[in-house]
């Protein structure tokens, strides 16, 4: 048997495998062939882990040094969320963050990925100021995948397009319908129509 073995696991990987094990389809409507393989993988993984210590990598395996540069507070929150989700996925206790004395492997990260992450992160932050809908925070968590240095160019481009579309759709969920108003004094009641397609309430401050 192997002793003193430590596991570092990205919760996004396990969640994707769990989704596969629940059944999936490949466009247009062909049933995926990996359902049984995914189910068996989860069984084998839990058996292999046994009582070994498990550490949760940040969701999406972003380059830690780069992610922390954006915000230490956000990174701490990401570590906490990642450990909770991995523990739920594996059905056992895990530790947030990397084990002691663990050193991140030096890997170059695409400047395009960093730029895309910076832009989309900023847009999500603005959207989150008016709505606390869970889909916003979920998108923000998944966005960290863009900072994964293991992504090849094709995967990076696909994710960038996918996340850009997702963030744009979120931005379109909250909008003010256009109208023409005549203001005759400093204080007026203006009939403004605001459309909120989020499930959660939104708080909007309009400045004229």
What are these regions (language model features)?
Residues 1-208:
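N-terminal membrane-targeting/anchoring modules of bacterial envelope and secretion proteins
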């Amino acid at each position: 048997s192997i002793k003193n073995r430590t596991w570092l696991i990205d919760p996004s990987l396990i969640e994707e495998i769990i989704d596969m094990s629940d059944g999936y389809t490949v466009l247009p409507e062909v049933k995926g062939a990996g359902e049984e393989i995914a189910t068996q993988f989860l069984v084998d993984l839990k058996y292999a882990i046994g009582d070994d210590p498990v550490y949760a990598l940040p969701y999406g395996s972003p380059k830690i040094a780069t992610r922390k540069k954006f915000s230490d507070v956000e990174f701490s929150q990401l570590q906490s969320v990642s450990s909770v989700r991995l523990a739920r996925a594996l059905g056992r206790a895990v530790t947030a963050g990397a084990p002691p004395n663990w050193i991140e492997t030096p890997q170059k990260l695409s400047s395009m990925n960093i730029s895309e992450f910076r832009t989309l992160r900023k847009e999500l932050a603005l959207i989150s100021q008016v709505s606390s809908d869970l889909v916003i925070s979920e998108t923000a968590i998944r966005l960290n995948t863009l900072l994964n240095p293991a992504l090849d160019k094709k995967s990076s481009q696909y994710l960038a397009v996918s996340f850009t579309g997702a963030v744009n759709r979120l931005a379109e969920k909250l909008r003010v319908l256009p109208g023409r108003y005549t203001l005759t004094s400093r204080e007026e009641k203006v009939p403004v129509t605001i459309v909120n397609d989020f499930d959660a309430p939104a708080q909007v401050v309009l400045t004229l």
